[in-house]
Amino acid sequence: MPTEWLVGTALAAFAAALAISAVLTPAVRKLALRIGAVDVPNRRKVHTTIMPRLGGLAVYVAFVSVVLPLFLWVYRIAPGTEEGNLFAALLTGGTLIALLGALDDRFDLPAGLKFVVQLAVACLVVFGFDVRIEFVNIPFGSAMQPVGEWLGVPLTIFWIVGVTNAINLIDGLDGLAAGVSGISLATILVMAALMGNETMVLMAAVLIGAVAGFLIFNFHPARIFMGDSGALFLGFTLAMLSLHEFKQITVVSFVTPLLIIGVPLSDTFFAIVRRVVNKRPIFAPDKGHLHHCLQQLGFSHRKTVLIIYGIAAFFGVCAVVQSLISKSGVGTWVTFIVICVIMFLLQIGAELIGLVHRTRRPVLDFLARLRMKLSAASRPK
């Protein structure tokens, strides 16, 4: 496909999805209020008035309305191919996940039921559409090895369910989940363009447009929440797109999708650690997420969201740079160093803002003791 055609098609698809989403969102808002799909404030939430949710319905409809004609009649994706399977899995699984989220927005479904349905959808994707991780690389080597179903299947299911829920966990401030998802999708689009993956470029462009149209009404002060219908749908599509882009996993390449979705995944990881440390159920909600900690430090609602946007953009840039250097001979070693540095910075940041515990700061305490010892050793005797 000529570059000019791809760019023009991607821009047109983006604009169409944005327009449809922007037009549908006010209508969805009225529908949510009419049927009682609302979010009632409580001590854990930052909003103080009843807010309509179900906003993800506008994102879903905008995405499907553009991507269906685009890939069936314009791009003419072939059924039965790898791209065709991805397309079918994305639409089928995405529809089921969006329906699950919409029902939860209205009826507040039990967490266990939602998890079981997500697991079933992930299994449908893996076994019904043959979308799975297939190869792995020996660490610091170059030989690709097939992983077999015993590893590829559970790893794929874990990835889909994990990322689907990770986006939902950060949906705590106006525009946060939508904006972070948009940044992650933009990263996928850039990397797909660099790799020459036209299908991924177009899919990402459509979804970015759908998210952007909704974000007009969701950024602070929000007039509607995306709800689980949006958070779960965006999480599922991000999992699918990143999984397709990096199906052949190496020590280098598997870091890339982790970086692309770095903010929700790291926040989810620290949430699990925090609840284990504090001896609370893993699925129990709390006010210890990244956005809560930043607000407790004195940042306003809008500034907190923009700071997290910046962190998400940083992860995105790291993903692109890491992907580019991985093609060189030193890529594995550079990636290993990058992983260590990012993990160290994440731990320092988590301890500084109390993301895990208010008083337990092992790395900061170690650095303080080390500084004291070095200072004492440098004094003249």
Task: Please provide the spans of the model-predicted regions.
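Extracellular/periplasmic helix-loop-helix junctions in multi-pass membrane proteins
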Residues: 319-337
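Short, highly charged, low-complexity non-transmembrane loops/tails of multi-pass membrane proteins
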Residues: 356-378
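Membrane-interface capping segments at transmembrane-helix boundaries
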Residues: 27-30, 346-363
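Cytosolic, membrane-interface loops and tails of multi-pass inner-membrane proteins
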Residues: 27-52, 270-302, 370, 374
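Hydrophobic transmembrane alpha-helical segments of multi-pass transport and channel proteins
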Residues: 261-269, 317, 344-348
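Alpha-helical transmembrane segments of integral membrane proteins
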Residues: 296-314, 320-323
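"…together with the soluble PPM/PP2C metallo-phosphatase catalytic core" -> "…together
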Residues: 2-268
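N-terminal hydrophobic signal/anchor transmembrane helix of membrane proteins
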Residues: 244-250, 336-354
